[in-house]
Amino acid sequence: ISSIKTNNKIINVVASIYAKENGLNNCVLLNKEKMVAEFINSNIFIIKNDQIFTPTIKSGCLNGVLRKNLINILKKSSYSISETDISTFDLTQSDEVFGTNVIQGLFCVTNYRNKIYSNNQSQQIIKLLNNNLS
């Protein structure tokens, strides 16, 4: 996975087909180190113990416009945000997970594998984002 936006979206296309064939709304894309890079069509953020984490650009995630804006907004707020490596185990241990892209904005993830997430903090972050972008 590359952080450079290109016309080569074969991984995303194959992942989208896999998701559709298996009744999934989305898939988590992993890099060659088997660390989380992003969702099929969006950046990924996790919340654990009131701290927000998102994969580093080195993970292969796209440095999306909304991702950059949200990180800047969160850094200026009372939230703690860190760019770090995220494993699939981290996803199962998170309190909340959300994604961002310019089409959907910020959306809450309801579940991953057998883990069901709340979305209380994610909803507050949506309000913060909307207030800062309007």
Protein language model regions, located:
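Helix-start/capping segments and mature chain N-termini
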Residues: I1-S134
